Amino acid sequence: ITGDLTNMETLFSVKELFNKILNCKNLDSRPVKTYVNNSSRTNYIFNTQISNIEKSDFILLVGTNPRHEATILNSRIRKSYLKNNMEIYSLNDVGDLTYPYKVISSNTDELKKIILNEHEVSKKIISAKNPIVIFGQSALKLNSSGYLFEGMKKFLSENNKINDDWNALSVLSNNASTVGAYDLDILDNETIDNVLSNKFELVFL
């Protein structure tokens, strides 16, 4: 299991060691199981550049507290709110973010309604010019995270909110090495399942 702050050179070397020398595929970069679709890099990066936050006119936070997880991002959201008076929604109450936001519910059924275009927030996303939906890591730990993430991506794509000029779906990583590890394909669901089930005799950290 690779660490949260491991640089890419070390990640690459460890992968080469395990795969080519030890002939072992039991390698993962996640300390806990989270949903990742690494078929495309856009599925696990923050697609909206920080500098483009101010162009947004609607933000939906899903399982994230940007004030604690990404302070620079949070300050940009605050700046955009003050400048554009944009609407901000959160799937749950995450406390004081230094700007007002509307709490939908902590129940994932509400997010399912948004995905199915059966919620008022669905209409707001569709009518927005540059909406942003930010998935945090806690949302990606849910048993239903795969359905929710892929469903949201499908909803945004069908309504032209994911296109060559704007990708409304972003993933906020908590750790410095996460994206690099995913780029190197250091992911294996069977491995992390076996680690969590204590099936290995030796775990190399």
How does the language model describe each region?
Residues 1-205:
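Catalytic alpha/large subunits of respiratory electron-transfer oxidoreductases
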